[in-house]
Amino acid sequence: MLLRKEFTFDAAHRLERYRGKCEALHGHTYRLAVTLNGRSDDEDMVFDFTELKRIVSEKILTELDHAYLNDVMDQPTAENIALWVWRKLDESVKRPNCELHSVQIWETATSSVIVFREDVE
């Protein structure tokens, strides 16, 4: 069973090793989807949505929302942001009944990246 929660955050960045308009400082309203894969526990839930919101807020949004992403990570492409989120969340959401399935980052309404476990290991 897949459980998913979505978040948004606003941030600025520039792509230093890219030649094009994204080389200049600019911002996005990013959308983040965190998806867990698992089975229901003794409370008949894969994961408590409130707990997932708290974890993502503490580990991800406090660092990325209204941030200059170049101060947080090197070359903050959508791909690198998704990998960064995965690494920050993986252990925090792991339970006997579930684990992180995917992290999806939308840079625009029509452009996104999805990271799976095999992309990180």
Question: What are the functions of these language-model segments?
Answer:
Residues 1-121:
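Charge-rich, low-complexity N-terminal segments
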